[in-house]
Amino acid sequence: MITLITEQLQKQTLDELKCTRFSISLPLPDHADISNCGNPFQLVSEGASWRGLPHCSCAEFQDSLNFSYHPSGLSLHLRPPSRGSSPKEQPLSQVLRPEPPDPEKLPVPPAPPSKRHCRSLSVPVDLSRWQPVWRPAPSKLWTPIKHRGSGGGGGPQVPHQSPPKRVSSLRFLQAPSASSQCAPAHRPYSPPFFSLALAQDSSRPCATSPQSGSWESDAESLSPCPPQRRFSLSPSLGPQASRFLPSARSSPASSPELPWRPRGLRNLPRSRSQPCDLDARKTGVKRRHEEDPRRLRPSLDFDKMNQKPYSGGLCLQETAREGSSISPPWFMACSPPPLSASCSPTGGSSQVLSESEEEEEGAVRWGRQALSKRTLCQQDFGDLDLNLIEEN
């Protein structure tokens, strides 16, 4: 099989290659002069090769409707004849001349969006044709203002005047549209959320009627649209909403708490699309745990660390000399000698003392005990007992 294919390929030459023709229905001019390009009714058989075709820079017409072109030729553009010259005067070579593309007629690509262009908050160029299906989510941020201030605390409710119906309702009843100004009353739709920020460009203040759900321009409304940041998602806080914010002198028990405000917060509410920097809502963040105050480390007592038990010494000699009661050696090592014998004027005689003398004697005794601890039993810090430190 392979040998048959190779033999056929060797026998094949360029003369045997058939030309590929494109049949395109093309209307011809009525009386065109096509003498330069040969007979238009010339029949070309499919078996003819490229070398058999006459060398002509133009297309060859067949049956006055179909034409085949040279492989070296480019795409041909038919230019319509001008009004001043008749089709008889124009030869077909001028009619079928390739026309250079006009740079003015080329489609201009749109400019790339800027860095600050946000897709979620973008506004199209033609605001009148854009009617999105987006509606505000049923969250607490879109409740009417007249329902605010009815929650919260156990204190007495503060009575407030309900705002007029024209500016009270902020609920969107129908599909919003992106109109840059307040729409007239005959429009059957209401503006979206960012038209509140765009409405400050208009000369007349805007208001809404809750019956029809459409926004209208009214010069007799109480206040213009509240100025806010352009395309902001934060809820609009106008003069009506600022009346229900708690003042600096109010307490949580005296002023009602707003239902859309989270409990325990006293700052302005934030939208879901904006980052929230509240520590209470950060879950799963690793922090250094503070030390438990119930488990305190024992403080180091250097006076106890300096005590070193030993069998013989100055303290034992002093206590044996005074004839005190027998006590364990670790207790006698640093216990001061009893001062009853030294405090009495006569060596072993007992003496009845008054209360004031007993208090003075107790103070002198404590002072001597502290002095004896420092002088008799004090060791330098380089000679510490590790076992005693571990026990303490």
UniProtKB/Swiss-Prot annotation:
Sorted UniProt keywords: Acetylation, Phosphoprotein
Gene Ontology biological process: protein import into nucleus
Composition skew (Basic and acidic residues), residue ranges: 278-303
Record has Transmembrane as a keyword: no
InterPro entries: FAM53 (IPR029356)
Residues where Phosphoserine is found: S122, S162, S232, S234, S255, S273, S299
Region of interest (Disordered), residue spans: 77-120, 141-167, 203-303, 340-364
GO cellular component: nucleus
Disulphide bond pairs: none
Family: Belongs to the FAM53 family.
Protein name: Protein FAM53C
The organism's taxonomic lineage, starting at the top: Eukaryota, Metazoa, Chordata, Craniata, Vertebrata
